[in-house]
Amino acid sequence: MNPIAVTLLTGFLGAGKTTLLRHILNEQHGYKIAVIENEFGEVSVDDQLIGDRATQIKTLTNGCICCSRSNELEDALLDLLDNLDKGNIQFDRLVIECTGMADPGPIIQTFFSHEVLCQRYLLDGVIALVDAVHADEQMNQFTIAQSQVGYADRILLTKTDVAGEAEKLHERLARINARAPVYTVTHGDIDLGLLFNTNGFMLEENVVSTKPRFHFIADKQNDISSIVVELDYPVDISEVSRVMENLLLESADKLLRYKGMLWIDGEPNRLLFQGVQRLYSADWDRPWGDEKPHSTMVFIGIQLPEEEIRAAFAGLRK
């Protein structure tokens, strides 16, 4: 049985999550999508209470399913599985909408800390919506607005038709999250192919989509930022493990996400790793082949000690 792919939708208040959800729920896209949201919009549905956890599940005319959280996200996720297994509903994808002030971190960790959820669901990616009109003000006032961007695998920039030129905002987003490509979305209308199959939590070689180049001096220092570390020499696996363990010991509470591809001394294959806060995984990938070996890592977090991190990895040179 293949696990159900999960997309997490985050973004600050007014960023356009509801508009995007309306697009997902009303389009005849052929996907069998279940959506967990906090409040239901004005949609024509057949209501029914299913399950002993009082999770409200609604089946829409295009085959999508709406599910309101009761008390705990775990309950809603398990209720959906119960009803899927009983044949009451059908879905092969799940989209979860976070509230505007929610920290995506605990929601992400739900899929790695519950045995049944780990087996039955596969966290595919985090999509962050950013309001181009109000984003700077929101990120200046609320670290959570930066955090939502920091966790993202894709960033959707909304209201650009009103905001106008957004190059400086693009740069600020890249300073926060060097991993995530930015797409413009108008009134929630976007190719769902850009939202799905991001493989954000899979071990893969695309550590950074495009290394950002900055043309503007930042008006305000972000609390959350990306650190991209590149090494052109091999590293000893025990030594790089020690550096990573020290980093997690000292900064796990500050780390949001991190990902990397390592050139390990004496090994023909690349080593890939990815993590969220304290949870991480690593595995061997394909051989380097004709590609010039190198290491690339990106760390996204809250006021990370950049000089110390760079010095620790620089100390691995033999």
UniProtKB/Swiss-Prot annotation:
GO molecular function, one term: transition metal ion binding
Highest taxon above the source species: Bacteria
Residues reported in the UniProt entry to bind GTP: G11, F12, L13, G14, A15, G16, K17, T18, T19, D161
Residues engaged in binding Zn(2+) 3: E167, H170, H187
Positions that bind Zn(2+) 4: E167, H170, H187
Nucleotide-binding in keyword set: yes
Binding site for Zn(2+) 1: E37, E42, C66
Known partners and oligomeric status: Monomer in the apo form. Metal binding induces oligomerization. Forms homodimers and higher oligomers.
Functional summary from the UniProt entry: Zinc chaperone that directly transfers zinc cofactor to target proteins, thereby activating them. Zinc is transferred from the CXCC motif in the GTPase domain to the zinc binding site in target proteins in a process requiring GTP hydrolysis.
Protein name per Swiss-Prot or TrEMBL: Zinc chaperone YjiA
Biological source species: Escherichia coli (strain K12)
UniProt gene name: yjiA
